Structures are given as structure tokens and as C-alpha cells.
Amino acid sequence: MAEAYIVEAVRTPVGRRGGGLGAVHPADLGAHVLTALVARAGIDPAAVDDVVFGCLDAVGPQAGDIARTCWLAAGLPEEVPGVTVDRQCGSSQQAVHFAAQAVLSGTQDLVVAGGVQNMSQIPIAFASRQAAEPLGLTDGPFLGSTGWRARYGDQPVNQFTGAEMIAAKWGIGREEQEQFALGSHRRAVRAIDTGRFARETVPYGEVAVDEGPRRDTTPARMAALKPVLDGGTITAACSSQVSDGAAALLLASERAVRDHGLRPRARVHHLSVRGEDPIRMLSAPIPATAHALKRTGLTIDAIDLVEINEAFAPVVLAWLKETGADPEKVNVNGGAIALGHPLGATGARLMTTLLHELERTGGRYGLQTMCEGGGQANVTIIERL
């Protein structure tokens, strides 16, 4: 059976909104990790078959197939193509899936997968709101569709509403959310201070570490914040941060490993994606994880480490309740609440962190999943070699 191997994985530090990466052109962020990836892997970049990048809100500096632009901005060979993927927040995890599938199919041997996002320059959902308004398009991507309205009516399609629905369904109160968020910051600060991210991170200028983790946050400060929605439980403290960053991985076939003298660090054991209620939107990692475990015959206890995106605290807390996973194996170095969530780059960032942490701890299996717009979730299981 064919295999898809992960050979290398790197990322920028994650920048805070308006922080050290805020003024950097997104193509230059992507070029930075591509340059580092090629150098670390020691490959001839002309041997790469394709570059698959995730990116949302593809307008302005993120428009025009930014995967291709990043590669060219890095000064890499013009004959190598690039394609940009949008599966909402799971875009660069899907990029890894597409890269692995190309390798597994035997049609390609060396594929770069990754993602980039500069949310300081292009705000979230800009493409569906502000960019469309000058054209007189004010209904967003859903309400103007007669088929959508016939099926879902005029229910709000909103991530905050979805997070509140999860909190209500699984009985997750504000205090539980804030305790989880506090733990995310503490884990992230510990990871930075002990150098756990050093191998995976490529500094950009003076930005050498993730800017998001708050050393001084306290339960009292979190409790003082107002909910985003009236009468709700979700606050900024329990939500992922607006961020900038990029990440990239190199996937290779057995033939490429042999021909280029590469060292496989992990193999892709499983990849899948599932969907459910697009209004609740953010709970799809639960059925998607169950599906992946059933397909592989693995139990949740067999998974050594999990990276699940902390879009909102209830997303992870509901997933923990349903899967019975050990919280000490989940987001051990913090998550998006502390580290940030540069949308189209986050999937590749999570996979990069998962690979390096498996190597640090000696674990065998790592599972990555994340909630996505439209009520979807990717799941990837890798096996450290």
C-alpha cells in the first residue's frame, strides 16, 4: 500500500492583531515558511509537484491564488504551480489532506501543504461582507439563496451563536469556559518558556515567539468581560484570537523519500472530513472524530496527543465530554485561545505543532481536528516514525 510521509514542518510565530506581523504582506509570510521548509528538507525545489495553501478572505493582498504568489515571492522555481484552498478554518488542514491524497494516489511525489493569513490587514469575513457591499450584495453567502432559506429559514449563521448553542446543549457554563481558557494561556506560556516551540518556529524579523499568550491573565479579569451576545456566556477571553501567521509542511511518497534521501518523520495514518448542522456549525469535530476512530479501529485512548482548534472554549469542552479523551493529552501546549487563530494557516500550524510534540514526547499517534464554517470538521491521524 502506498504511504504519504511528512518530512518537514515549520511555522512562523503567530502574531497578535496589529502586532509584529501585522504590516507584513501575506505573500511574504508564506514565502518565509516556504524558504525555510525547502532549506530544512534539503530538496531541490524544482522537484516539488504542487503547493497547496489554505487562505480565507481571498481579497486584496490575499487574492489571486496566494499559494502561487507565496512560492514565487520566495524566489522558488516558476515551473512549480500552486493552488489555494478554502474550507473555512480547516483550509490548511484540508491542504494537508489534498497533498497526502495526491501522494497516496501515485500522481505526485513531493507536495507542499500549508496556509497563510493576515487578519490584521483583512478582517474575518471581509470577503462576504465589506467586499460585497459596494456591489449591492448585502445578504451574505446564505440568505439570498432560495434553497438555503427553504431548508434553514432565516436562522443566524454566526460562529458566536453556534458557540452559544454548544454551550447550552452540553451544559458548559461561563466559569468552566474561563478555567479552560486560563489553562490554555498557562500551557502556552510554559511551552514558550521551556523552548517547546523552538524547533518548529522560524522567526520573522524581531518576532521570535508567539505574541498571543497572556502571562498576566487571571480569573478575575476574565470574569469582568461582557459576553459577546446579550445573555450569553461567550466572551473574548473564551474565544480564539485574531492573528497573523503562516505554516508549511512537506509531504513525500516512498519514491521521493528514496530518490531525494529524505527522512520520514511521520506517516499519514488516516484522513477524513465530515459535516453536520451548519447552524450550530462548530460541533462537527465530535462526529468526525467518531468516524475517524471507527474507520481506523483505534480507540481514543490509543491516541497519544490531540490538537483540536480552540475556536471557542465550548468547542473543545464538548468534544472532551463526548469522546472521553484525557484532557492531559489535548492541546498540551495551549491552543488558539492563547496562541491565536490565523484562519487559513491554523490547520497547518496545528499539524506542525502536533508532529514536533510527538517527537518530543515519544508518542506514536497524534490526532488533529477542528471546527469549520458550514458545520464541517477534518480529522487527520498521523503516526510518528
Label for each model-derived stretch:
Residues 27-42, 66-70, 95, 159-166, ...:
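Short, well-ordered amphipathic alpha-helical segments that serve as non-catalytic structural scaffolds
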Residues 162-164, 197-200, 204, 269-338:
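Active-site pocket-lining segment
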Residues 1-25, 36, 220-283, 287, ...:
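Condensing-enzyme catalytic core mediating Claisen C-C bond formation in acyl metabolism
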Residues 11-12, 23-27, 31-32, 40, ...:
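N-terminal extracellular/periplasmic Venus flytrap/periplasmic-binding protein-like
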Residues 24, 55-109, 153-159, 216-241, ...:
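Conserved catalytic cysteine-centered active-site region
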Residues 87-117, 167-196, 248-255, 342-361, ...:
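Active-site-proximal alpha-helical scaffold in enzymes
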Residues 110-165:
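Flexible glycine-/small-residue-enriched beta->alpha junction loops
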Residues 22-111, 116-134, 201-209, 279, ...:
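Conserved beta-ketoacyl condensing-enzyme motif
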